[in-house]
């Protein structure tokens, strides 16, 4: 019998789905319940019923599961950024291990016992205030005061969040102070519906090891009224290395515009990642959790098993940090990235490290186009590292990888589902999946990364 909307029942949550919803079974149908924890006994109301499954909401928790804890953030539910703050961190790690295992078993069709699968790699003492970058939308609260926060799920309604647990305390304090200065100067937040108002976002970045700090106002116009005083005040009060203005006048939800100018300081901050020196403005992609990223990079280097005479190809390389962190262990590195600023940054870092182009070079190209060209030219890298976006590798990239026939392929993925899909294709083309290592780069959120090691079967 099919479940009906508004039907109420009592049930026990068995586990979590890949989007961190609780999963229960009622009358033979799966019911997905946001905010539930494994082992919870709940009274659940069906909010949407489909043919073979349904979605529910918790009306009451009759008995909490062993991993449920009281959230330490008052707005984590409407904000939605911390989808797992109602779980103990140990339970969260178990769940994330399960997310990755399920992706490879169900979507990839793998027998998980056929390769080395490890529990999630996590820094248990580094689960709060870990973000080195935040982009906060600016708006008005119910009383008309200027606030920052995060968008409620599937909306552009700002949930005020003056004390986010994921970002450093100075970023929270600066956001509060900036809102007060904007309000005192009569500077209105941008209104998406009317296209009026001035300030769209506050963008902050921190060099985790260097301690350098960046602030950027994203504005609907050329600048801010009383700009010099506002920027100087914030620079002095929060020891900012640099302050910038980004101009974005487009009627769009894209955060950054193309034009950025420096108000104070050098316009960039410096840091290191896995020993690689980095310069960052606002456009460069950079891992937001530095210590956890260094853990991930170490695992990727371990999986690469580089030899001194190897040619390493780094696809979707960003600012080149993964490949450059491995360069001391190989002869030649080639990186490919589609974002021009990232490629220029990678070349600058390579030059700073004293690496000539014949040892480390970077190309601004689509990964698929570059891989196809290299394959057609007869390139045979010994090791290929890929770090694709959430959509995974495209067919051109995967086909070219097979043609180039690297001894080892290391895949770093922010989406276990597409990683499993791509690994399945590669296994059908002569590769063996050797190892899968989940890594928690985003504690208290639903996201989990993984690192794969694949080898060519002829070896």
Place the predicted regions along the sequence by residue.
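Short, conserved phosphate/pyrophosphate- and ester-handling motifs at nucleotide-, phospho-/glycolipid
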Residues: 39, 167, 289
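Short, solvent-exposed loop/turn elements at beta->coil junctions and helix N-caps
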Residues: 118-126, 192-193, 201, 205, ...
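Rossmann-like S-adenosyl-L-methionine
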Residues: 2-10, 18, 222-237, 241-459
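Carbohydrate-binding surface patches
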Residues: 203-207, 212-223
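Extended interfacial segments that mediate partner engagement and assembly in macromolecular machines
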Residues: 59-70, 77-189, 209, 224
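Short beta-strand micro-motifs enriched in acidic
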Residues: 36, 45-49, 137-141, 205-209, ...
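Short, acidic/hydrophobic/Gly-rich beta-strand patch recurrent on exposed beta strands
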Residues: 22-27, 149-152, 216-218, 346
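Terminal RNA-binding accessory module
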Residues: 1-75, 111
């Amino acid at each position: 019998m099919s479940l009906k909307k508004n039907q109420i029942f009592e049930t026990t949550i068995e586990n979590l789905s890949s989007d961190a919803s609780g999963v229960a079974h009622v009358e033979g149908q799966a019911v997905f319940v946001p905010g539930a924890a494994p082992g919870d006994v709940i009274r659940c109301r069906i909010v949407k019923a489909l043919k073979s499954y349904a979605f529910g909401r918790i009306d009451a928790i009759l008995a909490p599961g062993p991993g449920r804890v009281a959230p330490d953030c008052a707005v984590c539910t409407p904000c939605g950024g911390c989808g797992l703050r109602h779980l103990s961190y140990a339970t969260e790690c178990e769940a994330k291990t399960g997310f990755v295992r399920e992706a490879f078993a169900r979507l990839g069709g793998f027998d998980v016992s056929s390769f080395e699968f490890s529990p999630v790699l996590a820094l248990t003492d580094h689960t709060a205030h870990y973000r080195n970058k935040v982009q906060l939308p600016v708006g008005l609260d119910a009383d008309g005061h200027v606030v920052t926060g995060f968008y409620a799920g599937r909306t552009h309604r700002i949930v005020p969040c003056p004390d986010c647990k994921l970002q450093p305390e100075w970023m929270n304090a600066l956001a509060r102070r900036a809102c007060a200065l904007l309000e005192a100067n009569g500077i209105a937040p941008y209104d998406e519906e009317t296209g009026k108002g001035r300030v769209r976002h506050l963008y902050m970045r921190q060099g985790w090891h260097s301690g350098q700090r960046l602030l950027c106002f994203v504005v609907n116009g050329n600048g801010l009224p009383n700009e010099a005083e506002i920027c100087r005040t914030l620079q002095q009060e929060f020891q900012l290395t640099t302050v910038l203005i980004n101009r974005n006048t487009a009627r769009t939800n894209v955060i950054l515009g193309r034009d950025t100018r420096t108000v104070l300081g050098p316009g960039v901050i410096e840091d290191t990642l896995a020993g690689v020196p980095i310069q960052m403005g606002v456009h460069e992609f950079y891992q937001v959790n530095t210590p956890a990223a260094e853990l991930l990079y170490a695992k990727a280097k371990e999986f690469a098993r580089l030899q001194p005479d190897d040619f390493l190809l780094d696809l979707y390389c960003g600012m080149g940090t993964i490949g450059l962190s491995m360069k001391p262990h190989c002869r030649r590195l080639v990186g490919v990235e589609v974002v021009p600023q990232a490629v220029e940054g990678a070349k600058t870092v390579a030059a700073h490290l004293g690496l000539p182009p014949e040892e480390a070079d970077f190309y601004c190209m689509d990964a698929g186009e570059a891989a196809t060209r290299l394959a057609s030219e007869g390139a045979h890298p010994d090791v290929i590292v890929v770090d694709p976006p959430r959509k995974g590798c495209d067919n051109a990239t995967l086909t070219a990888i097979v043609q180039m026939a690297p001894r080892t392929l290391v895949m770093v993925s922010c989406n276990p589902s597409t990683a499993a899909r791509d690994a399945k294709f590669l296994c059908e083309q002569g590769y063996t999946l050797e190892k899968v290592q989940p890594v928690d780069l985003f504690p208290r959120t639903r996201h989990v990364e993984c690192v794969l090691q694949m080898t060519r079967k002829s070896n």
